[in-house]
């Protein structure tokens, strides 16, 4: 185009060429406006998870039903299982969703390392704590083993982290 031709002929930048052309045509050269920065406010993860929990309903998860687990009181969000993750002191660190087809996702901003999903309540200081890889396994174990606490470490890479914190 014309600006490129002027820039090449005079050995200057496109911006400098545009200024020269504006001067020749007696046109004011617009000054660039600074980009308005909108402060990005990200809600704390516990607050975002609380909002998701409030939107959820209680029901039976198709994912768990396919695995043969009858658990009618699960938290569901758009037909996906909504599992809140936490630390030993009860701090909410995020959530995992599991779709009916088994696709698992962590909610954006979830802190996975050292977090787990409770499959049974932590009452006092339990004598036995069983840590499983995933939630379905944790539920199965909690139905078979009524003494103690069962935790799901979200995935294999987090098993050691959770075990070290529990110890």
Language-model region placement:
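Phosphate-handling catalytic cores of nucleic-acid transaction enzymes
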Residues: 60-63, 71-74, 93
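Phosphate-handling DNA/RNA-contact segment within nucleic-acid enzymes
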Residues: 79-167
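Secondary-structure boundary/capping signal
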Residues: 13-14, 29, 71-73, 149-150, ...
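Short glycine/Trp-rich loop-beta-loop segment that forms part of the substrate-binding cleft
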Residues: 68
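Short linear motifs in intrinsically disordered
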Residues: 53-54, 73-75
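Non-catalytic accessory segments of DNA primases and related replication-initiation nucleases
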Residues: 1-63
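Residue-level detector of intrinsically disordered, flexible termini
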Residues: 15-16, 45, 49, 74, ...
């Amino acid at each position: 185009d014309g600006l490129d031709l002027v820039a090449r002929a005079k050995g200057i930048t496109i911006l400098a060429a545009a200024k020269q052309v504006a001067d020749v045509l007696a046109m004011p050269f617009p000054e660039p406006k600074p980009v308005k920065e909108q402060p990005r406010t990200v809600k704390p993860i516990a607050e975002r998870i609380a909002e998701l929990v409030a939107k959820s309903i209680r029901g039976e998860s198709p994912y768990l039903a396919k695995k043969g687990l009858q658990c009618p009181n699960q938290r569901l969000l758009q037909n996906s299982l909504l599992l809140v993750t936490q630390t030993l002191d009860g701090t909410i660190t995020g959530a995992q969703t599991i779709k009916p087809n088994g696709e698992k996702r962590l909610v954006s901003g979830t802190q996975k390392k050292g977090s787990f999903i409770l499959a049974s309540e932590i009452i006092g200081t339990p004598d036995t704590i069983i840590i499983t890889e995933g939630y379905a396994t944790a539920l199965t174990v909690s139905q078979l083993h009524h003494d103690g606490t069962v935790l799901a470490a979200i995935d294999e890479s987090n098993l050691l982290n959770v075990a070290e914190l529990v110890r």
